[in-house]
Amino acid sequence: MDASAINNLFLIGALLVAASILVSAFGTRFGIPILVIFLAVGMLAGTDGPGGIVFNNYPLAYLVGNLALAVILLDGGMRTRVSSFRVALWPSLSLATVGVVITAGLTGLAAAWLFNLTLLEGLLIGAIVGSTDAAAVFSLLGGRGLNERVSSTLEIESGSNDPMAVFLTVTLIAMLASGQTGFSWDLPIQLVQQFGLGALLGLGGGWLLLKLINRMELATGLYPLLVVSGGLIIFAITTAVGGSGILAIYLCGLLLGNRPIRSRHGILHMLDGLTWLAQIGMFLVLGLLITPHELLPIALPALALALWMILFARPLSIFLGLLPFRAFHDRERIFIAWVGLRGAVPIILAVFPLMAGLPNAQLFFNVAFFIVIVSLLLQGTSLPLAAKLMRVTVPPEPAPVSRAGLEVHPTSQWELFVYRLGAEKWCIGAALRELNMPEGTRIAALFRGRELLHPSGSTRLEAGDLLCVIGHEHDLPALGKLFSQAPKRGQDLRFFGDFVLEGDAELAAVAALYGLKLDGLDGHQPLGRFIAHEIGGEPVVGDQVEWQGLTWTVASMEGNKVRKVGVRFPEGSRPGPGLFL
């Protein structure tokens, strides 16, 4: 390759990335998933598009896909809070194992019949498309305001179900290549090895990487590079010894993100950019790899297979996988079933048969690609509507307009939060000394217009003020309530109910206030504990139960404890005046 060809490669690559970014700004206005846009740009630049680029280098696509997926999972792990495991760990693991097997099996049976394949070939297609995609889930769920049980289950499932799909795919390819027709008893051992080594090396390697980062004094910009390179080392070593590198790098990120670490905000900031670049690069390459005219002959059976998987196989796997977990409402199960987003992982797995030289390998690849497109277009675009219909969203927590880390010491967790005060804020007109600031927080600066004020305790806040507060992440809920908008009738109150009660209130007192019958219940127990017991499992904000003809909604949580409960009366009923006290 001469200098001119290299320069042209740089130019084409930069143009494709820039085009993807610019087009995505228009596409998102029409509700088109951003990953579909990246994929479409790659297809337009490919063989059948105006770009006419011929790209059929499957090993390179495999390399790019795995590298991008590793970066995406590392970032996703660092942004996942361990506290979410309280409600979602075991359900997610059930879906990541049993759920994938059921989805792959049912989809494989249908694929064998629709495409006139052998049972093993059909099951291979099922295994290829059997797992949800972390890149798609993290990208499309961000900022949707889903309740914690649903969002955590979907995110942890997508970050941990790829090992099962990879294991099934590799096993079936080996069986087809060797002519083996029966399953070996070694398979469960190999499965345990994949998950066991992935978990052990991911957590162990992550701990060693954390210690190294916190002991090394480097230039600020080098810490993110050390995290990425360390994560990739763990990914590669785990894969080399027969474990799941995908699971290992996700758990590595999870450990790093939930422990005190140097330059946390710098690491997350750079990882955010790298993750976007990884998603763009991965979907561009996969878009270049496909030849659209080859999809036309298989369009009808592939569409039928996609609909079978979306409407039957995935929902059945969800309902069976979540059967032991009674805290999940049917509407939550339906929504989780619908958000079985397929993305880059099935396409990457579909490269495996091509690299192994299996018969019908191109068919497997084309079918997987078609299913991914249908999934992103159908499920991705309808996600906001599905969330609304299934009532799995909750009012967003008030958040600062910006936040930045303060490197006071190597593992400092101090942050600077910036709040813009609108006219509807509770605190407008209040003197600074009157603010009930959370313990350990301080007002660092107050801007009015373009001027930096020198505030005193008597300074009164005005609409439009910019308030800078120093605190910790755990102070955000209290600060949000302090500087949040005054709730308008019909917004948050409409969601949580007509009134919001303290979770510590005695059940007997609440029953007396509303004229309810306890029917032998312990009246001395707190209302929050009673509601949590009625929900079953671990409660989250937005959980609802019906009791005594009223709807009771968890309005606020503090750790595992229900702190506030909303109550809604039936339409047309008129609560007594005592309720307004």
From Swiss-Prot:
PROSITE patterns noted in UniProt: RCK_C
GO terms, biological process: cell volume homeostasis
This protein's UniProt keywords: Antiport, Cell inner membrane, Cell membrane, Ion transport, Membrane, Potassium, Potassium transport, Transmembrane, Transmembrane helix, Transport
SUPFAM superfamilies assigned to the protein according to its UniProt record, in alphabetical order: FAD-binding/transporter-associated domain-like, TrkA C-terminal domain-like
Location(s), subcellular: Cell inner membrane
GO molecular function: flavin adenine dinucleotide binding; potassium:proton antiporter activity
Pfam families registered for this protein in UniProt: CorC_HlyC (PF03471), Na_H_Exchanger (PF00999), TrkA_C (PF02080)
GO terms for cellular component: plasma membrane
HAMAP family xrefs: NhaP2
Stated family: Belongs to the monovalent cation:proton antiporter 1 (CPA1) transporter (TC 2.A.36) family. NhaP2 subfamily.
Task of the protein: K(+)/H(+) antiporter that extrudes potassium in exchange for external protons and maintains the internal concentration of potassium under toxic levels.
Protein name: K(+)/H(+) antiporter NhaP2
Provenance organism: Ectopseudomonas mendocina (strain ymp) (Pseudomonas mendocina)
Encoding gene (name): nhaP2
